[in-house]
Amino acid sequence: MRGNKAKIPRSINTGTYLECADNTGARTLFVVSVKKYRGVKNRQPCAGIGDMVVVSVKKGTPEMRKQIFNAVIIRQKKEFRRPDGLRVKFEDNAAVITDDAGVPKGSEIKGPVAREVAERFGKIASSAAIIV
């Protein structure tokens, strides 16, 4: 897992609802906490593209609902700037359910995936249809 070259604004707080962009059976995810987040006292943990979060499944198949998983954020609405000056933003906030190592649980990913995520998590990049 490599660091990001772009400075990603952390716009996804705990308590945010995300779309699940894979075929695991989950549809809506709820962010419980952020993995490897080191903040200060009384500051809400927040995440951006390429960060791993702990999520709870709110909508989906009965087997998936009310369960806790790790997920990687692959899209966010808040725009971010790449080192070459290009600004990128997506239509929705979306994540992919993974294990602790960052290997996706599903076999396909719906919609585009940010290039920063593809560089950081190779297994997510291999199952993505579009990398932006």
Swiss-Prot record:
**GO-annotated biological processes:** translation
Q: Specify the signal sequence span.
A: none
For this protein, what is any one GO molecular function term?
Answer: large ribosomal subunit rRNA binding
> Which branch of life, at top level?
Archaea
Statement: the UniProt record of this protein carries the keyword Ribosomal protein: yes
Return the CDD domains for the record.
Answer: Ribosomal_uL14
Q: Which InterPro entries match?
A: Ribosomal_uL14, Ribosomal_uL14_arc, Ribosomal_uL14_CS, Ribosomal_uL14_sf
Please tell me one Gene Ontology term that the record gives under cellular component.
cytosolic large ribosomal subunit
Keywords recorded for this protein, A-Z: Ribonucleoprotein, Ribosomal protein, RNA-binding, rRNA-binding
Family annotation (NCBIfam families): PRK08571.1, uL14_arch
Q: What does this protein do?
A: Binds to 23S rRNA. Forms part of two intersubunit bridges in the 70S ribosome.
Q: Which family does it belong to?
A: Belongs to the universal ribosomal protein uL14 family.
PANTHER family in the cross-refs = 50S/60S RIBOSOMAL PROTEIN L14/L23, LARGE RIBOSOMAL SUBUNIT PROTEIN UL14
According to the record's subunit comment, the protein's assembly and interactions are: Part of the 50S ribosomal subunit. Forms a cluster with proteins L3 and L24e, part of which may contact the 16S rRNA in 2 intersubunit bridges.
Its protein name is: Large ribosomal subunit protein uL14
